[in-house]
């Protein structure tokens, strides 16, 4: 263990990572550099500085990454209309590549020979952090304390703090759930949620009112798109992270974005989790709406066929992989004409698309109309089209093939 001289730790300032700081110092006799990222988790990150200083940390990195997170990770993901297993908007998964990147950047800047994280040995995050780290710095050493130590309960962690005089802040009103938050979503796991039959308690949800308690009057919002990304809300241009903050507020007020699922983790187990992704729920509906009038049919269908694979790549932690980059290049190319405006109605947990328009629209009213089209579409042409497409079916039926 003496070959480890300096470690960069993904540090939240909470119980687990505060214990990890001291554990790394004691176990590896190394210097610890802490890195705390503000990706919109809704908590002050600056107090992490004082906590790290109290633990003897000399190099402390605290960074506001909200704009980079939404611009370079969330928006590219939403260009693909990405959902995992038909429901999950990948709020936790998409935050890990940026954190892994900054851990490696800081390791390079400080001359550290290892990185460390507080992900457990049961979850997906250990995979996501470490796959990203190895892709960006192949020879880096990764220390995952939860896979090494025997501090496998909150009681043992608190006892460790008491024995070593590590200050622990016990917040009043702190949720008993295991939670993870960023600008895209907040997740809840543990306690009664470990029973897939138990309904989540109403006071668990932090970002949204219940649909029943949402206003009786709908809220309308218009989103402007440029090359597949939202650039304005109700005509007001905004930076990407401000767009998401704005949509989170609007959606949360209208009871939008709650999800309760059992998902298949990459490590092999099934896990029940509850998620609030208010702004992301709006973004998914709106993006599909603007694509519906601007994308060629076959391009849209190709994108839809690739989306589950793209979602799986991100969920499993392969953001920094050649397959993700190849898929991203194709997805981004499809967005060149995804420009225009979508109007949505938000009402008691529902997001309804009520209008869409674009200068790049492929919707031709003269052809699509049920009224007189002045010869724009000759209905007689349909007969040959149908006969050609039925040819294989007619041949098979003529040979006596049974379906």
Swiss-Prot record:
Superkingdom of origin organism: Bacteria
Pathway field: Amino-acid biosynthesis; L-arginine biosynthesis; L-arginine from L-ornithine and carbamoyl phosphate: step 2/3
Compartmental location: Cytoplasm
Catalytic reaction(s) noted: L-citrulline + L-aspartate + ATP = 2-(N(omega)-L-arginino)succinate + AMP + diphosphate + H(+)
Amino-acid positions noted as binding ATP in the UniProt annotation, renumbered to this chain: 10-18, 37, 118
Coiled coil spans: none
Binding locations of L-aspartate: 120, 124-125
Residues at which L-citrulline binds: 88, 93, 124, 128, 178, 187, 263, 275
Short name of any one Pfam family annotated for the protein: Arginosuc_synth
InterPro entries given in the database record: Arginosuc_syn_C, Arginosuc_syn_N, Arginosuc_synth, Arginosuc_synth_CS, Arginosuc_synth_type_1_subfam, AS_cat/multimer_dom_body, Rossmann-like_a/b/a_fold
Gene Ontology BP, a term: urea cycle
GO CC, one annotated term: cytoplasm
Alphabetical list of PROSITE patterns matching this protein: ARGININOSUCCIN_SYN_1 (PS00564), ARGININOSUCCIN_SYN_2 (PS00565)
EC number: 6.3.4.5
Keywords: Amino-acid biosynthesis, Arginine biosynthesis, ATP-binding, Cytoplasm, Ligase, Nucleotide-binding
UniProt-recorded Gene Ontology molecular function terms: argininosuccinate synthase activity; ATP binding
PANTHER family: ARGININOSUCCINATE SYNTHASE
Subunit and interaction comment: Homotetramer.
Family, per entry: Belongs to the argininosuccinate synthase family. Type 1 subfamily.
This protein's name: Argininosuccinate synthase
Organism from which the protein derives: Marinobacter nauticus (strain ATCC 700491 / DSM 11845 / VT8)
